[in-house]
Amino acid sequence: MLRLILAVALVAACLAFPAAKDGPSPGFQKAFQNFNPNAAAGFGGNGMMGGAGMNPNMFNGAQGFQGFLPQPHQKRDSYQHGGYQHQQSFDNFQGSGGMNNDNSDDSFALRNFNNDGY
């Protein structure tokens, strides 16, 4: 009797949780439908939100979303307007070119995207 109960429980578990080879569930697919696992860098660790490329292909660049940490070549801009007050902005976004804020104000918005390189 115990074996029968265990067998039924095993079959029920297999039906409730499909095998990995069947692919992710529809709910999982919906939640991650915009995530590109083939992105150049993927989820790295260079900055907030994990940094080195949250689907960089979305921004047409190998580096993608670098995070909010200023990069060495950007500090001349990031620190000119009263210190690190742009931490809630996309100042350090780097697509195929880069983000500078030479002409930026203090509003929290995308600033001066330069697609030609920095």
UniProtKB/Swiss-Prot annotation:
Report residue spans for region: Disordered. Answer: 63-118
Does Secreted count among this protein's keywords?
yes
- Say which domain of life the source belongs to: Eukaryota
Which tissues and organs express this gene's product? Expressed by the venom duct.
GO CC terms in record: extracellular region
Q: What is its main location?
A: secreted
Q: Does the keyword Signal apply?
A: yes
Q: Show which residues constitute the signal peptide.
A: 1-16
Q: Which UniProt keywords apply?
A: Neurotoxin, Secreted, Signal, Toxin
Give the location in the cell.
Answer: Secreted
Question: Per the record, where are the segments of Polar residues compositional bias?
Answer: 85-102
Which GO terms label this protein's molecular function in UniProt?
toxin activity
The misc remark on file is: The mature peptide contains only 1 cysteine.
Its protein name is Turripeptide NCR-01
User: Which species does this protein come from?
Assistant: Gemmula speciosa
